Amino acid sequence: MPLCSIAKRGKMSGKIEFPEPDEVLTAKPSIKKYLRYLLFFGPGAIIASVTIGQGQLILGPQIGAWAGYKLLWLITISFASYLIAYMGARFMLLSGISVIDLFAIKTRKGFLNWIFILIILIFLPLFVAAIVTTLGQSMAWIFGFGHYLIWGIATCVFAAILAIVGRYRVIEFSQAIFVAVLGIGAIVSVAMIKPDLMEIIPNYFMIGNTPSYPSWVMTEYPSLAEKPVPLLMLGYLGTLTVSLVTLVGYLGWVKVKKWGIFKEKENPDAFSHKLLERFKKTGKIDYLPDDEKEVKKAKILLKPLLLDLMLSFIIVAVVSSAYMIAGAKLLGHNIPSDINLLREQAVIFSSIAEWLRPLYQLSVFFALFGTVYGGFEAVSRMVYETGKDLSRKIERVEYRKFMFYMMIYMLATGIPLAILGYYGLSIILMLSITLLFIGVVGIVIYGIGTVYLGRKYLPEKYRMGKIWYAITILFLLLFVVPFFCFI
């Protein structure tokens, strides 16, 4: 069988032919069509669930309590990570080759891939420790008995087992449910607060506005006041982004979904590998058709990707805004501490109406459990996709087996740090530093590489327009604004 589907009777010898798009993508505009578009929401649900759970419930209300609405602009600039996620996945769905594979080939001994892997292996245990702590606290609070560490460790081990034995479709479906619960909870809470929108909306566009700690923070929370505001800003920005973990994991998930060039392919990984081998021989992507009909077809096949990421960003932005606004309106001087990260935030729901407390508890559980459950898959997929071109051993290992090894590493390193957190190590500080690297620094490096590769290697007809490249670069520049707040 040839490398891939070849155009009829050699009319485009050596060129592939893109598969036909789903009927819904080419149908005439209608309400039914746009409702069916929602069925494409899949990998983006994992991104949304993991993104919200990786720190929104912890840092969002806390920042809202002392900064008010002044840092809502961080949600705006987090859009940069979604643009980068789109560009990276777009490159792969058009060419069949992952940008991560090109990083391995085009940098000295896969230097960039090693940087990504080191960032994950060094900082991931801190993240696992934070999740073990917060998930354990939520479980102990919900059920009313038991030590939070026992709850946290047991629940994380249970989630790891589910992730190993479960199929990707189960993970995707469960994350969609988790996201629905979170979205409903956030919208209900803010709707009942009835905030002043005219006071809130301008803050989304006041890029660079850096508040100082109020005087009451200095006196009532001296340990918080010791932390530089820009560090907390960067940590919070990291909770909003498509992190380095989910950026690379997303490339694997869209292959599993068989979107774009992978549509109708029985083995997307093998197909991608063949195209990569061809690229290694020629040094260019010379197999994409020049025919305008094929180019148009290829771009229509990108619609599921665009819809998936758009829905993901909207959900994350809405939920993130809700928790910061609720923190500003309701928490007052009650900033959540390392010991009671979640319990003290129950006021966000219960002060509105006591019956909303269970909704908050349910939202917390789904957010954190969804992060652990989806996160185990995301981290394993990220390290696997990043490392398979660096090591033949990784490439030869069956993915489920590799995932099991990653689970052991994450639990064996994260649980001891969670225990140290019980003895005084700051969970919020651990989370902020971790998200700074996997949610900000890693994104900037990946983004620069993706923009460069897209312009250099995609044939001109398949590149994004110059305006979109300019917008992406602009948002990347805005993305580093919090770093300048240290000056």
Where are these regions (language model features)?
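Membrane-interface "cap" regions at the ends of multi-pass membrane proteins
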Residues: C4-L57, F271-K281, K297-L306, M310
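Flexible loop linkers connecting adjacent transmembrane helices
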Residues: P19-L25, G60-G64, Y86-F111, Q137-M139, ...
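Juxtamembrane transmembrane-helix boundary signature
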Residues: I47, L74-K106, F116-F123, F127, ...
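Hydrophobic transmembrane alpha-helices that form the core helical bundles
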Residues: L112-G144, F369-G387, S426-I427
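Membrane-water interface regions at transmembrane-helix termini and the short interhelical loops
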Residues: T134-I142, C156-F178, I184, V188-K194, ...
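Loop-to-transmembrane helix boundary motifs in multi-pass membrane proteins
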Residues: Y148-A154, G387-Y422, I471-T472
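Membrane-interface loop-to-helix entry segments
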Residues: L162-D196, P202-M206, S432-I445, M464-L477
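Hydrophobic alpha-helical segments and their helix-loop junctions in multi-pass secondary transporters
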Residues: A180-P222, S243-G252, I445-L458, P482-I487
